[in-house]
UniProtKB/Swiss-Prot annotation:
Swiss-Prot/TrEMBL cofactor(s): Mg(2+)
PROSITE patterns for this protein: G_ENGB
CDD domains in UniProt: YihA_EngB (cd01876)
One GO process term, biological-process aspect: division septum assembly
Source domain of life: Bacteria
Protein name: Probable GTP-binding protein EngB
């Protein structure tokens, strides 16, 4: 998709604050600092539209980005950040669960993992949870520019094995915000699901 018009329309913490115009939504989930904002910025061809931060846990609300008046990207708070209080983690969990299990406009979830590492327990739990609710999933292995292309097959195998990857309802893509590798493939998946 050629993107010229993007607007962050709202930050929400509950269903009463979600957009009401019925546009399809694609949610982005992953650990803190896995690259959700960088993926968003690359997809919409903007450098700093979605705020990136070296400080994990920056996103604390569901951020809705209207893309070309056709769909919303929904940036979900990162999980697994130790310095967030237990109460805050629980509140994030409730907010995310409410959104993912009840939002009819949600067409799919892009679940980000770090290409350099085996998925964390949180990554695995998120994948299993999305799979349980029959939500289409694109697993995006970010920071792929940090590993050689010759190691892609091994990295993909490690990630898929750890997640218990199901080829029936899930897809997989390497991605780099530095080189833009995988950008077109991610857009193709999004367009198939909206």
């Amino acid at each position: 998709m050629d993107v010229h018009n993007v607007e962050m329309v709202m930050s929400a913490v509950s269903a009463s604050q979600y957009p009401t115009d019925g546009k399809p939504e694609i949610a982005l989930v992953g650990r803190s600092n896995v690259g959700k904002s960088s993926l968003t910025n690359t997809l919409i061809q903007r450098k700093n539209f979605a705020r990136t931060s070296s400080q994990p846990g920056k996103t604390q609300t569901l951020n809705f980005y209207d893309v070309e008046d056709k769909l919303y990207f929904v940036d979900v708070p990162g999980y697994g950040y130790a310095k967030v209080s237990k109460a805050q983690r629980e509140a994030f969990g409730v907010m995310i669960e409410e959104y993912i299990t009840s939002r009819k406009q949600l067409r799919g979830v892009i679940s980000l993992v770090d290409a350099r590492h085996e998925p964390s327990e949180d990554d695995i739990s998120m994948y299993e949870w999305l799979h349980y609710y029959n939500i289409p999933i694109l697993v995006v292995a970010t920071k792929s520019d940090k590993i050689s292309r010759g190691k892609f097959n091994k990295a993909e195998s490690v990630i898929k094995k750890a997640l218990g990857f199901d080829n029936e309802d899930s897809d997989f893509q390497f991605f780099s915000s530095e080189t833009k590798y995988g950008k077109d493939e991610v857009w193709h998946w999004i367009e198939q699901h909206i």
